[in-house]
Amino acid sequence: MREHLRVSDADFEVVRRAWAAASSADVDGMVAELHPEVVAIPFGAALEGKAYRGPEHVVRWLRDEILVSWEFFQVLPERFERVGEQLLVTGRWKARGIESGVELDIRASWVVAVRDGKVVYWQTYTDHGQARREIGLDG
């Protein structure tokens, strides 16, 4: 069953706060929204077959791969759908390389799960159809 989330939906707010914190390099703010058993699979990690398990590894990814490479990095959720116990989030991420100055503006989708009021899982997709299939919807 799919339903569009209302702005007041608690799970939506958790995701919004986590990504706002990451987008502003607020590491402590992001950690506050992560479940102790979080599994994060950002786009680059998915390409390498990696996952970051636990808040400390997500923080290491943020500090060692994002904050050192990008002058700014923004995750901008635009639409949320609940599919069972998970969320399908669509939006974009924007970034500018520190050394290269290259700017990115990429459409993205995320499959997200929230448990106990914290993000416990997320995977980033640049192929919306693949994200839909992953969450059990038609591509």
Predicted regions and their residues:
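Short, low-complexity N-terminal intrinsically disordered segments enriched in polar/charged residues
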Residues: M1-P36, R133-G139
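A beta-strand edge to alpha-helix "cap/lid" segment located at domain peripheries
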Residues: M1-V7, R63-G139
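Short hydrophobic/aromatic segments of transmembrane alpha-helices and their interfaces
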Residues: F12, A40-I41, E103
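Hydrophobic pocket/interface hotspot
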Residues: V15-A18, M30-L34, V38, G54, ...
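A solvent-exposed, acidic/Ser-Thr-rich amphipathic alpha-helical stretch
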Residues: V27-G29, H35-E85
